[in-house]
Amino acid sequence: MKHGIYYAYWEQEWEADYKYYIEKVAKLGFDILEIAASPLPFYSDIQINELKACAHGNGITLTVGHGPSAEQNLSSPDPDIRKNAKAFYTDLLKRLYKLDVHLIGGALYSYWPIDYTKTIDKKGDWERSVESVREVAKVAEACGVDFCLEVLNRFENYLINTAQEGVDFVKQVDHNNVKVMLDTFHMNIEEDSIGGAIRTAGSYLGHLHTGECNRKVPGRGRIPWVEIGEALADIGYNGSVVMEPFVRMGGTVGSNIKVWRDISNGADEKMLDREAQAALDFSRYVLECHKHS
């Protein structure tokens, strides 16, 4: 497995100096830095090349996370919005190719956060989304990018809430580079068994986010990590595992993620670094010690 962390653990906005965090996570011992997609459409080719060179120079693989806006909603009943969303992803995927990024994950099939004041049409949105994702998947394949669809809890989305729904959706899209993405935070809310959910995803699992039920780093709460490690071993998972802790209030990140108290207990950057490094050591051990010989 390759282990990573989402840059926003340290940040309060959905953009940052990614080169700074590449160098940081390399020193902490990570393999992967996950960055946000939102600023990438505004990068020049020079900026893209500089970021790619920084990642390569530090031995860091970049993955990308994205919470699509309502204007990027591939499931929208408005054909103009779906057309705009397809154009957005086409441009973004070409940029990921230039950046040498091979994985994007998130609520790519819908938008985030959901406006629940509007009427929900799960069946219609599902059908439109499957058709749209199938079309975008062709571009992703040409760009060498896995398109990973994140299973989210009911408070953040309504289309795909369980691993089984994720597998059903991916099977309907029927494209090799469209995969299921699971997250321990969301599974803790929706699944009867986290290990069972991972086994349900099986070979369709393309990306895994980790974190505690209160968004702390792995190992600081009650998520059943041994069970998760055993399930990953059972399905032979050897892909990316990216921790996605959110522990700081403030900014767009704190508002979107609903962090209303300082979960970090006043930690400064160095303390956050130490927590991340300890969580990395914990994750490497508990998630990989069950591998079948």
UniProtKB/Swiss-Prot annotation:
It catalyses: D-allulose = keto-D-fructose. Optimum pH is 8. One of its GO terms (molecular function) is cobalt ion binding. Keywords: Cobalt, Isomerase, Manganese, Metal-binding. Substrate binds at residues 6, 107, 156, 183-186, 215. InterPro entries: IolE/XylAMocC-like, Xyl_isomerase-like_sf, Xyl_isomerase-like_TIM-brl. Its EC number is 5.1.3.30. Binds 1 Mn(2+) or Co(2+) ion per subunit. Can also use Mg(2+), Fe(2+) and Ni(2+) ions to a lesser extent. Mn(2+) binds at residues 150, 183, 209, 244. Optimum temperature is 55 degrees Celsius. It comes from the Bacteria. The active site is at 150 (proton donor/acceptor), 244 (proton donor/acceptor). Disulfide bonds: none annotated. The keyword Isomerase applies. Homotetramer. Belongs to the hyi family. Involved in the biosynthesis of D-psicose. Catalyzes the reversible epimerization of D-fructose at the C3 position to yield D-psicose. The enzyme is highly specific for D-psicose and shows very low activity with D-tagatose. This is D-psicose 3-epimerase.
